[in-house]
Amino acid sequence: GLAADFYIVMCRTADLDDPGADNDKMTQIIVPRKTPGVNIVRGVPVWGRSSSHCEIIYDNVRVPKENQLGRTGTGHQAAQDRLGAGRVYHCMNSIGSMWRAFDLMVERIMTREVHGGEKLENKQFMQGFIADSYMDIQSARLMTIHCAEKMESGADPRTDISSIKVYVPHAYHRVVDRAIQVWGAAGVSGDLPFASMYQGARTLRIADGPDEVHKILIAKNVLRRYHAGETWDFGN
């Protein structure tokens, strides 16, 4: 964005009516920021705050052929190869943040006194928050580990990648939401990390592909298996 020295631009390098799949007509090209014709219009605020994201206009920009990344037509596949590992990384990062939110929530439940000096930990609502958050974190963690192991083994991880891409941000959102509720007004203040966590969890449901697209991919992969006369093996 605003701080970058160069951009990786994925653009169409073949006509749409040319033979072949549309995805095979995309190529990645390195464009230095100071190249003539590269115009940064503005920084784009995210969640009401300044960010490194920006709007860029490319006006008759020309770069040497050597700036092409990989072979012509391989840009889309290169991006997809990166996204798989990137989605696992984002899920792992989210689980770490969920863990931190959980620690802060339990700390508050154990120390906060309410009417008559009774601790929040004796309230069944709060006990439910702890149990639900534990299950959210543990299920997200195990799903992500399973997906990473499948990627490392060379098996097809696409359904699992889409599954964690959908599930983990939702679990993250639920855990942080409970932590905010336990902390009350302090939970939405800048003294605690929940506001940025909350925004991050919600953003992840859009970044690298929205929930709806990944749910469609999951369903199509499952249906394809059953149409072939097979069942889904949840053990692998």
Describe the function of each predicted region.
Residues 1-40:
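A short core secondary-structure module
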Residues 25, 52, 162:
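Exposed loop/turn and edge beta-strand positions of beta-sandwich/beta-sheet ligand-binding modules
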Residues 35-37, 47-49, 72-76, 194-198:
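Short, surface-exposed loop/turn microsegments at beta-strand edges and helix-strand junctions
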Residues 55-60, 65, 74, 80-236:
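Alpha-helical interface subdomain recognition
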